[in-house]
């Protein structure tokens, strides 16, 4: 019978916690369903009852407008316990948000985890509509398909089939079928292995003239290590072909593209060296050392040809032929241009960090080499084979090329380094001007990381992110050559722009790398540092060793101990170049200190356009001292502001009691807006106002009365918000419920010093029992604030407050805690006879 007591009820449940974060509707929904009621998920016209607690204001308004019965959760509980339909008027719902101002709307956010239900067309209406729409669209496409349109189908095995709906004697359809059949037959050979390619090259040597053009644009380039064989891709790198590897072969779509890629290697070999018998396409997979030895010798011969030492008539003839053939076959791949009869191939890579501007010229002749150098040769051979365009002939490079192999490799490890960034854009720059023939032009590779670090050590980093400026790197030039020599006027300048942070390295490693590279070390056009130096006289017997700087230890100590008091614009002179070098080597530590102590604004205020040399510019110590002084000046006003007391929290505090969380949030927002108060959880010596949501006798209200605070209603805050400032408190004082509040407040205002009441001043010494409620500390504080005296031991007291389990004396009064509370509320000592505890 209990299952049908609410059979005529259609309920809509909206039950939330008072703070609006917990939704308890599901519990009461279950109870209503158990009693036979129907529960609606939406507030529709069939709803007869709304179970409401701390719900939305819109639900409340809609229910009142429709005349639906608004009941509290107690009605549901009473119906369940009584087993009958209880009258709804006995349990009306209460809307606590009805008096809140409409301008403050708090968005509810339920913190409870939702039950995850997998969406299906059966339980989700939106998903069902979407599913039906897709089914209709699919059916429409099937019906609208013309009968004469052939269909291409992909079977489960992955093969492509041609399925015409009706047989049409059309040449187009038969051609399509024939073409698809050819593709299916060739499918097994779309990605041949290296051995298959070598076999095809042996079977059909006439294909070495590359009859099939490459269909690969220069935007579809692949990385340098995409081809596992390494034989063809590494040599294609030498020829400037950046689009090699498996990806390139897949893009072609047929075997002709693969043969075309294979032919490039043999074509270049035949064009550059007609007498070269072994071609790279004829190499076996089992002979990597032979391949590497060929590559090493060809690299050396190529260097010698670039230097203009060995060029045979056959090679000159082959160079002309290669240029003509390459321009014909490479229309879609790397950009080709020739300068004064020399071939220049430039490719623009998209992602590889190794492939840069590439130039191929000269002859290749096989010889022996080492297998372990395969990777380093592949990664660093082309940067040293670059040719720069000039009016006369190729720029000459002094010294062997293989010496700089290890140093040259590091320059291209970081694709996003400043020099590589400029190298990628260098093809848009104008060609460099002719330089004096007496100077050795460094134009074969970029600076390595260690060399860049050495220059960074002597650079002023205060202008990072600003416009470019020019600095003199005379001392760096001297360090690179291990002999302090001065450059010609204007020739020792370098443009320092877009400086990025690099890992600092030891000065010895920097010098060793620069010295090992010898005179080949230089950078291409626009690489960030382009400079020339004189050919220094190296002392005999010191091919790779370095002489330590004399007296460097003492000079470093002097540099570290130096404290300059000059301004930013002044310069400090250094007596000799060794001292300048020692200072430069130890500058990074000062940079770190400066970065730690200097703010961003101070970095921007440091001199950014200073163009003096390393020797003449202000030392790092000057900049450090000046910037730190400026930083101290910058923070002085903040320290003075703290000392002066401005910016402190307000001295007055406001305490809320008997107030739900929604109203507390409103009070906090109003206090933040109108200022003048800070919120405190409990009444203390700084409290001046106590806000009570309901006229209940709480500890905060009692402590507020005892301290002479304003005890106000919640409306005072709302009216203050309405008027935009704190208004008078008297109209909102709860004097009817707490008559002692205005009396104690008046006494507090009239007292000269700290206020202390006189209510219990004439009473004997009291002892508060540890088992009392409110807690002992709060009760003792109340008695003390009202002028009473509290003892720590019961034998000294004449009045014992609270339950006492010890031996009782006839001369001592044992009173309830309510005696203290009622006396404070009424502001008079109540008769003790009404509060005596029973004697046991």
From Swiss-Prot:
Entry keyword annotation includes ATP-binding: no
Entry-annotated residues carrying Phosphoserine: 279, 287, 296, 333, 552
CDD domains: BRCT_microcephalin_rpt1, BRCT_microcephalin_rpt2, BRCT_microcephalin_rpt3
Pfam families found in the cross-reference section: Microcephalin, PTCB-BRCT
Chain spans, region Disordered: 184-206, 313-379, 418-437, 562-586
GO biological process: cerebral cortex development; mitotic cell cycle
Presence of the UniProt keyword Phosphoprotein in the record: yes
Biased composition (Basic residues): 355-378
Subcellular location: Cytoplasm, Cytoskeleton, Microtubule organizing center, Centrosome
Principal location: cytoplasm
Subunit structure of this chain's protein: Interacts with CDC27 and maybe other components of the APC/C complex. Interacts with histone variant H2AX under DNA damage conditions.
Protein name: Microcephalin
Lineage: Eukaryota, Metazoa, Chordata, Craniata, Vertebrata
Chain's gene name: MCPH1
């Amino acid at each position: 019978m209990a299952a049908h007591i609410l059979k005529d009820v259609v309920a809509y449940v909206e039950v939330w916690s008072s703070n609006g974060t917990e939704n308890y509707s599901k519990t009461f929904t279950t109870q209503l369903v158990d009693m036979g009621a129907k529960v609606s998920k939406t507030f529709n016209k069939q709803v007869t009852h709304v179970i409401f607690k701390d719900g939305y204001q819109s639900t409340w308004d809609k229910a009142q407008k429709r005349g639906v019965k608004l009941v509290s959760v107690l009605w549901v509980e009473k119906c369940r316990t009584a087993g009958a339909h209880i009258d709804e008027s006995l349990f009306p719902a209460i809307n606590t948000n009805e008096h809140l101002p409409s301008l403050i709307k708090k968005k509810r956010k339920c913190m409870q985890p939702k039950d995850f239900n997998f969406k299906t067309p059966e339980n989700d209406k939106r998903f069902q509509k979407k599913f039906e729409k897709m089914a209709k669209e699919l059916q429409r496409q099937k019906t609208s398909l013309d009968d004469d349109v052939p269909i291409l189908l992909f079977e489960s095995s992955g093969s492509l089939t041609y399925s015409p709906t009706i047989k049409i004697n059309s040449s187009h359809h038969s051609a399509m079928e024939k073409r698809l059949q050819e593709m299916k037959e060739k499918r097994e050979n779309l990605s041949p292995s290296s051995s298959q390619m070598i076999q095809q090259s042996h079977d059909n040597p006439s294909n070495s003239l590359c009859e099939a053009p490459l269909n690969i644009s220069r935007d579809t380039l692949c990385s340098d290590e995409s081809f596992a064989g390494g034989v063809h891709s590494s040599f294609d790198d030498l020829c400037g072909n950046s689009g090699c590897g498996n990806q390139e072969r897949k893009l072609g779509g047929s075997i002709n593209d693969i043969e075309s890629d294979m032919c490039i290697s043999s074509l270049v070999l035949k064009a550059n060296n007609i007498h070269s018998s072994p071609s790279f396409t004829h190499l076996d997979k089992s002979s990597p050392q032979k391949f590497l030895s060929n590559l090493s010798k060809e690299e050396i011969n190529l260097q010698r040809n670039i230097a203009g030492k060995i060029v045979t008539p056959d090679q000159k003839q082959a160079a002309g032929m290669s240029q003509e053939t390459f321009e014909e076959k490479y229309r879609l791949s790397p950009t080709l241009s020739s300068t004064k009869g020399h071939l220049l191939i430039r490719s623009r890579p998209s992602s590889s960090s190794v492939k840069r501007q590439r130039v191929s010229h000269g002859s290749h002749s096989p010889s022996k080499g080492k297998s372990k150098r395969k990777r380093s040769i592949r990664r660093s051979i082309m940067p040293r084979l670059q040719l720069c365009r000039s009016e006369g002939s190729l720029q000459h490079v002094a010294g062997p090329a293989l010496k700089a192999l290890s140093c040259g490799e590091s320059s291209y490890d970081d694709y996003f380094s400043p020099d590589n960034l400029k190298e990628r854009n260098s093809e848009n720059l104008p060609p460099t001007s002719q330089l004096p023939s007496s100077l050795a032009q460094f134009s074969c590779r970029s600076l390595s990381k260690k060399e860049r670090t050495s220059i960074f050590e002597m650079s002023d980093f205060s202008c990072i992110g600003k416009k470019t400026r020019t600095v003199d790197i005379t001392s760096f030039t001297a360090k690179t050559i291990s002999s302090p020599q001065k450059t010609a006027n204007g020739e020792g300048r370098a443009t320092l722009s877009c400086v990025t942070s690099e890992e600092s390295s030891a000065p010895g490693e920097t010098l060793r790398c620069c010295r090992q590279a010898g005179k080949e070390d230089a950078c291409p056009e626009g690489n960030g540092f382009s400079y020339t130096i004189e050919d220094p006289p190296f002392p005999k017997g010191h091919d790779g060793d370095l002489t330590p700087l004399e007296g460097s230890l003492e000079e470093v100590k002097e540099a570290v101990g130096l404290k300059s008091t000059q301004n930013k614009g002044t310069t400090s002179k250094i007596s000799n170049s060794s001292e300048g070098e020692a200072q430069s080597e130890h500058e990074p530590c000062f940079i770190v200190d400066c970065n730690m102590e200097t703010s961003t604004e101070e970095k921007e205020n440091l001199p950014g356009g200073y163009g003096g040399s390393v020797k003449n510019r202000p030392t790092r110590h000057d900049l450090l001292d000046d910037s730190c002084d400026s930083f101290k000046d910058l923070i002085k006003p903040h320290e003075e502001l703290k000392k002066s007391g401005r910016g402190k929290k307000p001295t007055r505090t406001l305490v809320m009691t008997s107030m739900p969380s929604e109203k507390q949030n409103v009070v906090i927002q109003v206090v933040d807006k109108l200022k003048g108060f800070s919120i405190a959880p409990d009444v203390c010596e700084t409290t001046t106002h106590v806000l009570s949501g309901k006229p209940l006798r709480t500890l905060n209200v009692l402590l507020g009365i005892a301290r002479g605070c304003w005890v106000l209603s919640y409306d005072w805050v709302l009216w203050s918000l309405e008027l935009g400032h704190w208004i008078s408190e008297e109209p909102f004082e709860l004097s009817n419920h707490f008559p002692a509040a205005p009396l104690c407040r008046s006494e507090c205002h009239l007292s000269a010093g700290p206020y202390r009441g006189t209510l219990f001043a004439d009473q004997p010494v009291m002892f508060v029992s540890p088992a009392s409620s409110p807690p002992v500390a709060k009760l003792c504080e109340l008695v003390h604030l009202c002028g009473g005296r509290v003892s720590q031991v019961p034998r000294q007291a004449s009045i014992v407050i609270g339950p006492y389990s010890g031996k009782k004396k006839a001369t001592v009064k044992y009173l309830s805690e309510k005696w203290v509370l009622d006396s404070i509320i009424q502001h008079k000592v109540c008769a003790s006879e009404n509060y005596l505890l029973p004697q046991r």
